[in-house]
A protein has these predicted regions:
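WD40-repeat beta-propeller superdomains and closely related acidic/aromatic-rich repeat-like regions
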Residues: 1-335
Length: 335
């Protein structure tokens, strides 16, 4: 990568700073409003008219965050699962009976939500009915299938594919090791997990064929699909790593693309909602944009004092929000 400060195009003059005053755990957009989930208790709403609103959603730390663009689902160390809408109105959807931390959350179709605590996963439907599943070890992550009512539950030893509305036993996709975050590909044909080791693992769901994606210098903490589902963007190395998923075999037998080489590790990625553009945050606070077609780069945020901890695009792709571990945050207007 060229010197990020003065040799490449920059949009840093289009950044609206947001004073969070706390570590940023995640950022999501509800309409045109960027919502920053802070380390302790609070969601910070930064609306387009420059107004800011803080909403306390947990009595303690926010451990997990998900959004479908209409509401934000959070899990806290207070054992609660809370949904917050664009008006800042909150609703408690779940309360762990043993007051365990809520480790992961996910939003599904038709108002369905999922969360985990310890070795249990829970699904709540729109009627408020809750079902649970016991797992062999602590849950690492949750994801809803883009097609049908299936929930992938990552844990030590693999991923359990759960059908909460069916009587059939869950399916197990086994691979030794501790599986953390889990994602379905947008077409529902592949399942990918990050692992405790510096690697990704995946399965082709049609035949449970294993896919191993390695070569990282650190644990992969962030991954995202491009809008067309043909590429998986990942952090975990001193560049952006893009795995090809455009064929029926996915990345099997193929090499990844590597973009934005840098001397610091990528720690956060977010794909543009309609174009082949990826935002990448690095451990020194730098945020870059990369266009897959030709590898062109744009500087969105200069390096700072702490790693990037959150990135998100709005639905149209005209705005990019970022946050860091020390609370530096902003919204880049690309419209």
């Amino acid at each position: 990568m060229a010197d990020a400060n003065d040799q490449i195009p920059s949009v840093t003059d289009r950044v609206r700073p947001v004073a969070t005053g706390a570590s940023v755990v995640a950022v999501k957009f509800l309409g045109e409003t960027a919502v920053f989930a802070l380390g302790e208790e609070t969601l910070l709403f930064a609306s387009p008219d420059n107004a800011e609103q803080r909403v306390a959603v947990h009595a303690g730390g926010i451990m997990a965050v998900a959004s479908d663009g209409k509401r934000i689902l959070t899990g806290g160390d207070d054992g609660k699962v809370v949904a917050t809408n664009a008006k800042g109105e909150t609703e408690t959807l779940g309360q762990d009976a043993r007051h365990r931390w809520i480790d992961s959350v996910a939003l599904g179709p038709d108002g369905v939500v999922a969360w985990s605590a310890g070795k249990q996963a829970f699904v709540r439907n729109a009627k408020g009915e809750i079902k649970s599943l016991d797992l062999p070890s602590s849950v690492g992550g949750l994801a809803f299938s883009p097609k049908g009512m299936r929930v992938a539950v990552a844990h030590y030893g693999g991923v359990t594919l759960w059908f909460p509305n069916a009587q059939a036993a869950p399916d197990m996709f086994a691979w030794k090791g501790s599986h953390l975050d889990v994602m379905f590909s947008p077409d529902g044909k592949f399942l990918v997990t990050t692992m405790q080791e510096s690697t990704l693992h995946g399965w082709r769901l049609a035949d449970a064929k294993d896919m191993r994606m390695s070569g990282y210098s650190a644990k992969v903490r962030s991954m995202a699909w491009t809008a067309d589902g043909k590429w998986l963007a990942t952090s975990g190395s001193e560049q952006l790593i893009m795995w090809p998923f455009g064929s029926k075999d996915g990345p099997m037998g193929k090499q990844p693309r590597m973009l934005i080489p840098y001397d610091k590790r990528a720690v956060a990625v977010a794909c543009h909602p309609s174009q082949e553009v990826v935002a990448v945050g690095f451990e020194d606070g730098l945020v870059m944009l990369s266009r897959l077609e030709d590898g062109a780069e744009i500087l969105a945020k200069k390096p700072g004092a702490a790693p990037v901890s959150a990135l998100a695009w709005n639905a149209s792709g005209s705005k990019l929000a970022f946050g860091t571990e020390d609370g530096e945050a902003g919204i880049v207007d690309l419209g």
